[in-house]
From Swiss-Prot:
GO terms for molecular function: metal ion binding; transmembrane monodehydroascorbate reductase activity. GO terms for cellular component: membrane. This is Cytochrome b561 domain-containing protein At2g30890. It comes from Arabidopsis thaliana (Mouse-ear cress). Residues 243-257 have a biased composition (Basic and acidic residues). Residues 22-219 form the Cytochrome b561 domain. Its main location: membrane. It is a multi-pass membrane protein. Its cofactor is heme b. Heme b 2 binds at residues 95, 161.
């Protein structure tokens, strides 16, 4: 009887590790198949997913952080007066091309997000991203439906196009910051360097944007100062020439004396 009791106790001790290992395995499976927020360890151990996140972020940065500002600045440069027609055409072509490439990159980034990432739309980055994607495509279609200048609808179209473009620029910048935060949260890697670099880039873009409004004034002032200096030099040369004539006219009188 005691032997049977000892065998039963030994079997219990042998079965306990097996039960605990099965429980750990099942908990790991639940963690892997669970939401992204509750299992960051599985994502950190997946280099392919980290690479896809980086590609997604780079494409959206190129679209919203580079091409969209280029399109805005190029179209604003067209408002400078007295520009050659060829310059205006090049600026308009730059505006259209940059915006079309930006729309393509946004679309590819959105498709990558749907296919590769867990899109539960439970965080601000995903929610803002889907809304931004819809606005970007609506703005692109609105750009192709531009009415002629002589039509009355052109003014309403311009106001709507400007409002949508400004909204896309602001929301795109915000979504880049939220994307950097989401990247740091998912991969447990610091995104402070990228945040600082993007902030510095935004500061440079803002300076260029504010400076271009004053560029025409600076050019007009430079032209005015140059004309003034030319007039001043011509007046001095005229005065010196007149003074030379007076000296030569006074020479015969001095010789008579």
């Amino acid at each position: 009887m005691e032997i049977h009791h000892q065998l039963l106790v030994s079997l219990l001790f042998l079965l306990l590790p097996l039960c605990s290992s099965q429980e750990n395995t099942r908990s790991l499976a639940i963690d892997v198949n669970g939401p992204v927020e509750t299992s960051p360890i599985s994502e950190k151990l997946n280099p392919k997913l980290v690479y896809e996140i980086k590609v997604h972020g780079f494409m959206l940065w190129a679209a919203m952080g580079v091409l969209m500002p280029i399109g805005i600045i190029s179209i604003r440069l067209m408002s400078i007066k007295d520009q050659p027609i060829i310059t205006l055409r090049r600026l308009f072509f730059l505006h259209v091309t940059s915006q079309m490439v930006a729309v393509i990159l946004v679309t590819i980034g959105a498709v990558m997000s749907v296919i590769n990432f867990n899109n539960s739309f439970s965080n601000h980055h995903q929610q803002l991203g889907i809304g931004l994607y819809v606005i970007v495509w609506f703005q692109a279609l609105l750009g192709f439906l531009r009415p002629p200048r002589e039509e009355k609808a052109r003014r309403k179209w311009f106001v709507g196009h400007w409002i949508l473009g400004t909204s896309i620029a602001i929301l795109g910048i915000i979504n880049i910051y939220t994307g950097l935060h989401a990247y740091a949260k998912k991969t447990s890697k610091s995104a402070n360097l990228w945040t600082i670099l993007f902030t510095a880039q935004l500061s440079c873009i803002a300076l260029v944007y504010l400076f271009q409004d004053k560029w025409s004034y600076i050019q007009s002032q430079a032209t005015f100062n140059r004309n003034q200096s030319v007039d001043h030099n011509s007046n001095i040369s005229t005065a010196e020439t007149g003074h030379g004539y007076e000296v030569e006219e006074s020479k015969p009188e001095l010789e008579k004396c």
